[in-house]
């Protein structure tokens, strides 16, 4: 289902001019490249698909002193890619703060006994002190690894997530990794994800992907897992971090159409799933931004094709299932159609219930990796309209992909500052804003409903057909919550009769 609507291009262009007028000339010139309005849609491709132009600059270093909403390379590696691998211990190598303040913030669900065979929600740090900066921390790192192997013998590997001081003082974590891996006969992966590298968490994703290539795949080449037998319908689900159980909801659908998910990266993942990934027949990538690097490597090195899919909302679920099924042929295509038909009554019931309550409601999005585009059609499936969307750390190809989703006149903003985002929201007054925890409370103080689209506001899953029902319920609860009727003080709502005023 695709809604036919256009946004107010003139208003959105006026808003861009307004926010730029408040900057000094040099800053305004730089920020102008990051703000745009989606231009007219044109027909592209054999199926007549329409495409909007989202012409903004991206993946550029933020201006110092201007508050933006980005993270660092350490956040991209440890917090996104490696952290959810459940049977490995992930050391935050450096001062305690980075690990402490990022401890268990992402809702990466997993199955296992924490502290015994799974370690996702635990925080391990080398707790760098001043003397470690002066004399180096390699010996301390060796001691930390020894202690982990003694205290947690059921771990299947260790990653070393280096923080800023490690790169600045030049510690050789690679040498320590090789030494201790041989000594303990285990996998130890050094990740050079110091926070000062790159312009955002996006480089941390890339570095983490490279670490998988260099320290997992290359080490495993030539080795065969005799317990793992390949099949014709083996797939890897890559870039799904199981926020609120998303990966499990996606896996249900893929298995129902006849595929076997042999690895899920990296929500609820094990090291073994990562190691055997090159033996799958197809890589299905959900978060393109964070995991396209390793998919491209596997395509070049192991000839494994990859495709992007989207399980947000019934329109994209159906399109993705059919696209995936076409890769495997008539048998899987037939099963995919049966699965789509099976869930159609559920979809119809959800839409019948929530469409009257949500139709025409306007939404602004500002999130990370893929959600500023992937969730658009899920909102439209409920009759809602996207008036603005943007990314914290996107690259140019992300905005090219966004053109397939947005309508003409949509406000586009990259690496938005707090001032820009607040101004856009205050002037547009959407019915709902979907963004992160830092934006949640300022938006609610404006009297505008909000949903946290990084962690689903502690709800979920939002993937799959079951997830769509939860998604619709949550959007309805946010927008139609009676609390918004209490936002204005009673005395501001009161109207005093003219006659009464005259009598006084």
UniProtKB/Swiss-Prot annotation:
User: From the UniProt record, which GO molecular function terms apply?
Assistant: ATP binding; iron-sulfur cluster binding; metal ion binding; nitrogenase activity
Tell me one GO biological process term.
nitrogen fixation
PROSITE patterns with a match to the protein in the record: NITROGENASE_1_1, NITROGENASE_1_2
Q: Where does [8Fe-7S] cluster bind?
A: 72, 98, 164
Classify the source by domain of life: Bacteria
Q: Which GO terms describe its cellular component?
A: molybdenum-iron nitrogenase complex
Alphabetically list the UniProt keywords: ATP-binding, Iron, Iron-sulfur, Metal-binding, Molybdenum, Nitrogen fixation, Nucleotide-binding, Oxidoreductase, Plasmid
What Pfam family is a match for this entry? Oxidored_nitro
Q: Which cofactor does it need?
A: [8Fe-7S] cluster; [7Fe-Mo-9S-C-homocitryl] cluster
Write down how the cofactor binds this protein. Binds 1 [8Fe-7S] cluster per heterodimer.
> Coiled coil: present as a keyword of the record?
no
* Record's catalysed reaction(s): N2 + 8 reduced [2Fe-2S]-[ferredoxin] + 16 ATP + 16 H2O = H2 + 8 oxidized [2Fe-2S]-[ferredoxin] + 2 NH4(+) + 16 ADP + 16 phosphate + 6 H(+)
- The catalytic activity of this protein is classed by the Enzyme Commission as 1.18.6.1
Task: Mark the transmembrane ranges.
Answer: none
Q: Which residues bind [7Fe-Mo-9S-C-homocitryl] cluster?
A: 287, 454
The job of this chain, per UniProt, is described as: This molybdenum-iron protein is part of the nitrogenase complex that catalyzes the key enzymatic reactions in nitrogen fixation.
PANTHER family listed in its UniProt record: NITROGENASE MOLYBDENUM-IRON PROTEIN ALPHA CHAIN (PTHR43457:SF1)
Protein name according to UniProt: Nitrogenase molybdenum-iron protein alpha chain
């Amino acid at each position: 289902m695709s809604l036919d609507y256009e946004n107010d291009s003139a208003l959105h262009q006026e808003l861009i001019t307004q926010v730029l007028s408040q900057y000094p000339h040099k800053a305004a010139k730089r920020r102008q490249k990051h703000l745009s309005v989606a231009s007219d849609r044109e027909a592209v491709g054999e199926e007549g698909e329409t495409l909007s132009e989202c012409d903004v600059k991206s993946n550029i270093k933020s201006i110092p002193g201007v508050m933006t909403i980005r993270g660092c390379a350490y956040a991209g590696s440890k917090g996104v890619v490696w952290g959810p691998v459940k049977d490995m211990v992930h050391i935050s190598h450096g001062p305690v703060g980075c690990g402490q303040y990022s401890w268990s913030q992402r809702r990466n669900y997993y199955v296992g006994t924490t502290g015994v065979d799974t370690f996702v929600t635990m925080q391990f740090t080398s707790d760098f002190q001043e003397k470690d900066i002066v004399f180096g921390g390699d010996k301390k790192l060796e001691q930390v690894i020894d202690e982990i192997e003694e205290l947690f013998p059921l771990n299947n590997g260790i990653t070393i997530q280096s923080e800023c001081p490690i790169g600045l003082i030049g510690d050789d974590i690679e040498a320590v990794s090789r030494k201790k891996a041989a000594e303990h006969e285990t996998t130890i992966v050094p990740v050079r994800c110091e926070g000062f590298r790159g312009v955002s968490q996006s480089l941390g994703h890339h570095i983490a992907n490279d670490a998988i290539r260099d320290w997992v795949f290359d080490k495993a080449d030539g080795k065969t897992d005799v317990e793992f037998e390949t099949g014709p319908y083996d797939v890897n689900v890559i870039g799904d971090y199981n926020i609120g159980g998303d990966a499990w909801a996606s896996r249900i659908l893929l298995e129902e159409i006849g595929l076997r998910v042999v690895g899920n990266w990296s929500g609820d993942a094990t090291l073994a799933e990562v190691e055997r990934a090159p033996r799958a027949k197809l890589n299905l990538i959900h978060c393109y931004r964070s995991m396209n690097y390793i998919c491209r490597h596997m395509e070049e090195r192991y000839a494994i094709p990859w495709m992007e899919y989207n399980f947000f909302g019934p329109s994209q679920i159906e399109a993705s299932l059919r696209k995936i099924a076409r890769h495997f042929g008539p048998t899987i295509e037939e099963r995919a159609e049966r699965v789509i038909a099976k869930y159609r009554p559920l979809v119809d019931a959800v839409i019948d219930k929530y469409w009257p309550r949500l139709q025409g409601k306007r939404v602004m999005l500002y999130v990370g990796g893929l959600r500023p585009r992937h969730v658009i059609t899920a909102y439209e499936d409920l009759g809602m309209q996207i008036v603005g969307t943007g990314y914290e750390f996107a690259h140019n190809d992300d905005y090219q992909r966004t053109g397939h989703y947005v309508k003409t006149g949509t406000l586009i903003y990259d690496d938005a500052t707090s001032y820009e985002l607040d101004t856009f929201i205050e002037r547009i007054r959407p019915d709902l804003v979907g963004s992160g925890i830092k934006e949640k409370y300022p938006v609610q103080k404006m009297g505008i409903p909000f949903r946290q689209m990084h962690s689903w506001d502690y709800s979920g899953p939002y993937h799959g057909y079951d997830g769509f029902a939860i998604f619709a319920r949550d959007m309805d609860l946010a927008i139609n919550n009676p609390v918004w009727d209490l936002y204005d003080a009673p005395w501001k709502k009161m109207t005093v009769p003219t006659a009464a005023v005259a009598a006084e």
